[in-house]
C-alpha cells in the first residue's frame, strides 16, 4: 500500500465520504418523493392488498374475466385480480389516470432494433451500457460501439441524455433508472427501453415508475413463450396517475431531479478521489 502525504490522504478520504454522503442524500430524496406520491394518492403498502377470488373454497386461485376486458390477452397473469385493485387504488384519489404514452407524459418511447454490434477502441467509439449495468451509478465500461458503423442507430435509438427514464425489457423486467448527467451521449443496449419525458415531468415519471405499484403494472405487460419481455408498446399503455395537487406533483418531480444532480456530484467527487489515487500510484 503506497504511503501518501497526510494532506493527500485526507483529501481522498474527504472526497470519498462526501461522495457517499451525496448518495445517501440522493436516496433520501427519492424516498421522500415516493412517500409524497403514496400520501397524495392514499396508497397502502402493496403487500397489504388482498385480492378477492371467484371461489375461496376451490383450493387454488381462480377468477373470472369479462370478454370485454380480455384486451386480446388470454394469459392469466395479465388478468390477475390484484392488478384491478392496483388500478383502482391509483385512480381513486388522482385527478385522472392516463398512460405513459400520453403526449403530456412522454415525447417518445424508444425500443431499439436488434443489430450486430461492432466494438472498437474507446477513442473511436461511444460507451456502451448493457441492461445489467443500468442500475449502477458508475458502471465499468468495457465496450465501445463504433461511431462510424453505428452513427445513425446511435443517434436514433441508443443515445441517452440526462433525465431520460430507462426500463429494462427482459431479464429482470421492470428495473427503472433515470439517466445521470455523466451518461450523456452514451449508448444503451437495445434490451432497455428509453422514455424521453415531456418537459417538467421526468422526475415524477421516475418516482412513479420505480414504485411497487408501477412495477406490478409493468410486469403485467410481459409476454413471450420462450423469453419473457416487454416492448415500447407495453410501456406506452402503462397507467400513470396525474395528481390533483399540482404543487405536490411538481415537488415530487423536483425532489427526483435534485437527487439525480446529487448522484452526478457524487460521481464527480468519486472520480476526483480515484484520479488523486492514480497520481500517487503513478509517481
Where does each model-flagged region fall?
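A generic structural signal for residues embedded in beta-strands
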Residues: 167-168
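Non-catalytic DNA-recognition/assembly elements of restriction-modification systems
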Residues: 4-115, 246-283
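A short, polar/charged loop-to-alpha-helix boundary motif
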Residues: 178
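Short, surface-exposed beta-edge/turn micro-motifs
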Residues: 123-126, 162-164, 191
Amino acid at each position: 500500500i503506497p504511503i501518501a502525504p497526510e494532506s493527500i490522504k485526507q483529501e481522498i478520504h474527504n472526497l470519498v465520504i462526501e461522495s457517499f454522503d451525496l448518495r445517501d442524500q440522493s436516496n433520501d430524496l427519492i424516498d421522500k418523493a415516493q412517500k409524497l406520491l403514496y400520501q397524495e394518492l392514499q396508497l397502502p403498502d402493496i403487500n397489504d392488498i388482498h385480492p378477492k377470488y371467484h371461489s375461496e373454497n376451490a383450493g387454488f386461485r381462480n377468477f373470472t374475466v369479462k370478454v370485454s376486458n380480455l384486451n386480446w390477452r388470454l394469459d392469466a397473469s395479465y388478468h390477475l385480480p390484484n392488478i384491478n385493485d392496483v388500478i383502482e387504488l391509483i385512480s381513486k384519489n388522482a385527478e385522472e389516470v392516463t398512460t405513459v404514452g400520453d403526449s403530456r407524459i412522454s415525447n417518445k418511447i424508444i425500443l431499439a432494433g436488434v443489430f450486430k454490434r461492432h466494438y472498437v477502441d474507446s477513442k473511436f467509439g461511444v460507451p456502451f451500457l448493457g441492461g445489467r449495468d443500468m442500475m449502477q451509478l458508475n458502471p465499468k465500461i468495457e465496450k465501445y460501439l463504433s461511431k462510424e458503423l453505428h452513427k445513425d442507430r446511435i443517434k436514433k435509438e441508443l443515445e441517452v441524455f440526462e433525465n431520460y427514464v430507462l426500463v429494462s425489457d427482459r431479464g429482470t423486467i421492470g428495473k427503472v433508472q433515470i439517466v445521470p448527467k455523466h451518461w450523456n451521449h452514451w449508448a444503451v443496449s437495445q434490451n432497455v427501453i428509453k422514455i424521453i419525458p415531456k418537459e417538467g415531468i421526468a422526475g415524477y415519471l421516475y418516482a412513479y415508475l420505480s414504485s411497487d405499484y408501477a412495477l406490478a403494472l409493468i410486469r403485467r405487460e410481459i409476454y413471450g413463450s420462450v423469453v419473457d419481455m416487454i416492448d415500447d408498446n407495453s410501456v406506452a399503455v402503462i397507467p400513470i396517475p396525474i395528481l390533483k395537487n399540482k404543487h405536490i406533483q411538481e415537488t415530487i418531480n423536483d425532489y427526483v431531479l435534485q437527487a439525480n444532480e446529487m448522484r452526478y456530484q457524487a460521481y464527480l467527487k468519486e472520480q476526483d478521489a480515484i484520479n488523486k489515487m492514480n497520481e500517487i500510484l503513478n509517481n
